[in-house]
Amino acid sequence: MKHVAVLGGGPAGSHAAECMARAGLRVTLLDEKLAWEKPCGGGITFKAYDKYPFLRDNGAPKQFVHQTWLGAHGAGRVKMDLNQPLIIYSRRDLNQLLLDRAERAGAQLEKTRVLGFERLEHGWDIRTREGVLRADFCVVATGARNPLREAGTAWKPADTMVALGYFVDSRQEHIDIQFLEELEGYIWVFPRSGHLSVGICGKGESARQLRARLERYMEQNGIPIKDSRFYAHVLPSLERQSWRDNRVSGDGWLAVGDSAGFVDPITGEGLYYAIRSGDLAAQCVLDETTAPEAKPAAYRALTDRDFARDLYLGSMIARNVYMGRFLFDTVPARMIHFIRRSPRFRALMQDLFAGTQDYETLRERLFRNLNGTLQEVMLSFFCRRVVPELSNP
């Protein structure tokens, strides 16, 4: 394999291009915009920067956040310190960081729009505005709105969620997360370098309904809408059956990041999975022990073992996390109560924010700690409400 074309220059495509170019392959990365400000919170978890330290150790503008406030209807708000900080980037700055790394590794970057591609007996003809590029193999990294319907995940409307919001000229040091009544989604306020990203993501409601919810929240919390720049985007949020049928690879191509549907169905977080899938795609392409015709199956097996099975498990519980009930209240409200009163549950939530708690072992951990959590909640309630002087020795 002599020449690989990477179709898309977001985090997934950029990192795949870097890894392959660094190993000596000829790599051409094609993207219409290259670095641009994508509507996204821009959060990098400990799980991501622990595996890929360059996400932490670089000169790009970024914000280290050590504290979050979480709220839910009927439960108020609670402060939670993060054991491991979240790193928040402007997506333009993050994309530029990754593109620069790819270019330094030897990848050729071309700012052009991919109009389509055609499978040949040996390789691909890729049509762009400037002409036709021939490549031996393709890595598809064209994002959630993938225009290349022949490759990448083939999702249905139910497999997406709307994300929209505002870039606000304001500052704060912490993250805000607000769960809303009857919504499979949440509002976020992320501090970036120089501004806030204030947004909402959710399933089952129109963009107009979500925008109304967000603007009501902003007005209630004194966050200015006037002169703030609006953004909107579609995120993959695959349903359970769609994970089973997900099309992540095919004859001569591998899909990475959003174009493969690799986004957490509960949190909407996709940056770790973008970079990780780019890494795994590069490993698969570079593996000389795997024949070209066997690479699609090998890549699917790699992603399944590494993270895709866990995302599938997340899709099985996503609706209950937002819309379910537990102990006569909503699950989000109970989460707030438990964070406030139970050190065990608070530690679990800190691990979820760090990305170190997977969904496969989440149920077991919850049930293993349930008795202790409830005891802590009751003891906290007793000390603070029944005998308040005990909580203030």
Please provide the spans of the model-predicted regions:
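Beta1/beta-strand and adjacent pyrophosphate-binding region of the FAD-binding site
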Residues: 1-12
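Conserved hydrophobic helix-helix packing surfaces used for dimerization/oligomerization
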Residues: 4-6, 27, 253
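Predominantly flavin-linked oxidoreductase catalytic cores and closely associated redox partners
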Residues: 9, 23, 101-228, 244, ...
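Conserved Rossmann-like nucleotide-cofactor binding loop
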Residues: 12, 35, 145
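Glycine-rich FAD pyrophosphate-binding loop
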Residues: 21-40
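A conserved beta-strand/loop capping segment in the N-terminal third of enzymes
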Residues: 44-97
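FAD/FMN-dependent oxidoreductases across multiple families
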Residues: 116, 206-285, 289-297
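C-terminal helical "tail/cap" subdomain of flavin- and related membrane-associated enzymes
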Residues: 283-393
